[in-house]
């Protein structure tokens, strides 16, 4: 009996350790996924619109509402986004400088935040670095990134405001993403502004609890551990 109890205790500890590993892996997977989605949360929604309304007109329409604590990204491509936000925003991992403030989203002068892999492309005659777009140089206020290698490293974010949008495009030329923790309550209002009912989740709802690579490396051990517990309890 003592041996059986000892075996069960050891196996129980193994299950606890395995559970902690699963939780840790899930947290790492979620964080990595967030970084690959321009640091937007799992609640972020993609609005697919064919509207010819300009980005600036759209921001002006949003500014007239009571919406707060949100971030909107107008993605030109996989490496460039115009950003407008109001109120509290999710934390972005910074290597240097700062992320956009509410003041930047009211200013007529756009500023830039770049991923750490884009730093070498910047023009830096003094301590201030600049991002060149066509014939214009924009002040860089921050560098984002972590020790992980993610798509965030390659991204360029340019602030936008009701007063000015650089290279103002129409909505059908960009991908519109909204990160709002109250998206369910505000969804219809956003749909009205973006002139569309077509939406999708940035993060698929069927995202696995743990990563595929983790299952490949540890799945067999987990199955064996469970089987041993079953055998020990039946002995």
Segments the model singles out, each with a brief description of its role:
Residues 4-28, 210-235:
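Hydrophobic alpha-helical transmembrane segments of multi-pass inner-membrane transport and secretion
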